Amino acid sequence: LSVAFTKEESAETASETLLPDRPISPHPNLVTEAGLTSLELRLREAREAYEAAQRIDEINERRRQAAVPLRDIRYFAERVRTAQVIPDPTSTDTVAFGSTVTFSRADGRVQTYRIVGEDEADPKAGSISFVSPVAKSLLGKSVGDVGGSGTQELEIISIA
C-alpha cells in the first residue's frame, strides 16, 4: 500500500509541477541595453533557483521547488535569444523607442514615461511598453503635437 501511494503521489505531483509556458508576445522583442542586462540577470537567477531546487532530497518537494524556475528559464532564455537591442535615440526631435516623453492629459495631469521593451515596462517606475496604447499614440510625434486614441488626448511637452 505505501509503495503504491508513493508512486501515485509522485505521478500526481509531477503532473502538477509541469507549469505551462509563460506567454511570449507576438511583437518584436525590442529592448534597451538595460533591458537586455535585466533579462540576462533574470535568466541567471532562474537558473540558480532551479539548481538550488535540484539539491533537495525529497523528490516531490524538489519538483515543486523547481517548477517555477524551470518555466522562467524557458521564458527568459527565449527572450534573451530574440532580444533586439535598440540604441538610445540620437535626437529629441521626435518620440522614439527609448525616449523619455512628458505629456499632458486633457484633465490637466502631466506625466513622464520612458518608452521601452515589454519586459522592461513598469508604469509605476516611469516606463511603458512601446506596444502600449499611450506609447503607440506618441511614437513619431514632436513637442506640441497631440496624440492619443479615442477621447484620450495627450499633448507632448518635452522629449528627452
Region annotations inferred by a language model:
Residues 1-79:
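Helix-rich terminal scaffold detector
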Residues 80-87:
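Interdomain regulatory linker/hinge segments that flank or connect interaction modules
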Residues 87-154, 160:
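Non-DNA-binding regulatory cores of transcription-related proteins
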